[in-house]
Amino acid sequence: KAAWEFLAYKLAIAAGIEMAESSIEQVSGQYHTFMTKRFDRDDGKRVHFASAMTMTGNTEESIKDTSSSYLEIVEFIENYGVDVKANLHQLWRRIVFNIAISNTDDHLRNHGFILKEKGWVLSPAYDLNPSIEKEGLSLNIDMDDNALDFDLAKEVGEYFRLSKIEMEDILSEVRSVVKDWEQVAAEIGIKNREIEIMNSAFRW
């Protein structure tokens, strides 16, 4: 588990996803732990963080029988964010990356915001893991569809203030990184058998 999360981290950083500095360390015996620097602290002082669950006005109860959408996060950024365009572009890049590695645990608590002087910005991405257990994202990409489909992401690109050229550029950057996932996995010590098992999680 830790090795796969570290793989996702290395791919994400290379693909332009903002993340806190992380590492993998052998803590006891043969077991490894994924370590990440806290981004809700700055020189020991608490930085105000809130999950997208909170900021979109949702609760576990309110979404029990329905699926939330990335477009709800877009709406919050448009209304309360600073550096809106850059944050929307980063969020869309994260959607594309989640599709590329099948990070299907992308629910509202796994997205967050940090309060800056002038307003809210996306927090660094966290809890990214490839998965072969689900066939769709936790969040819908449009209001109704959570398919692991790059074309679906492109269909909503205008809500993220992206031109077609900008979308293709981001897609190209993410896919060119993810296509080398097996090599990166081998470099960090993931066994060939595990790589074979996880193969279907990756698309580019």
Residue spans for each PLM region:
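Conserved kinase catalytic-core segment
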Residues: 1-15, 69-132
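Conserved ATP-binding subdomain of kinase catalytic cores across diverse folds
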Residues: 1-64
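A short beta-strand motif that forms the metal-chelation/ATP-contact edge
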Residues: 33-38, 124, 179-185
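Catalytic-core segments of enzymes that bind and process phosphorylated/nucleotide-bearing substrates
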Residues: 51, 55-71, 76, 115-166
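Regulatory N- and C-terminal appendages and interdomain linkers associated
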Residues: 79, 120-122, 181-204
